[in-house]
């Protein structure tokens, strides 16, 4: 069994202040960390991927979609932005060396209709 820690406990944006935190997690025996991917910055995530690899830590990544980029919105422009932002998140997670990307990114975090998905929402989710 492997153990990892989600860095959202400390930050929503990776920066140099996280270096001692990540080093401490490695010293405690964690096998990996989950990196927040909330910005489009390939260079930043490439740098963090190298750091994590040098420390001997595995990397996973987390991202979310909001109301403004909801992949199952009834607004085609909002859906398109959601799909584009998911692609960017995948690119940034890959730059960090992440072995998986978790969400929720299939729909907007915290946006609820009070009922199950409609046929259109289901289709938009599949298309995204």
Predicted regions and their residues:
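Histidine-acidic metal/acid-base catalytic patches
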Residues: 1-9, 14-29, 97-99
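Active-site acidic/histidine proton-transfer and metal-coordination neighborhood
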Residues: 76-128
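Acidic-and-aromatic substrate-binding clefts and catalytic sites of carbohydrate-active enzymes
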Residues: 10-16, 35-47, 70-72, 109-113
């Amino acid at each position: 069994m492997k153990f990892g820690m989600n860095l959202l406990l400390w930050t929503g944006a990776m920066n140099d202040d996280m270096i001692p935190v990540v080093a401490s997690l490695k010293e405690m025996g964690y096998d990996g960390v989950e990196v927040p991917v909330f910005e489009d910055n390939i260079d930043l995530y490439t740098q963090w991927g190298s750091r994590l690899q040098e420390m001997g830590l595995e990397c996973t990544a987390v991202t979310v979609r909001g109301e403004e980029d909801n992949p199952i919105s009834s607004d085609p422009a909002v859906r398109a932005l959601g799909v584009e932002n998911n692609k960017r998140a995948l690119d940034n997670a890959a730059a960090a060396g992440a072995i998986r990307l978790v969400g929720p990114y299939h729909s907007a975090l915290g946006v609820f209709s009070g009922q199950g998905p409609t046929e259109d929402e289901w289709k938009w989710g599949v298309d995204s």
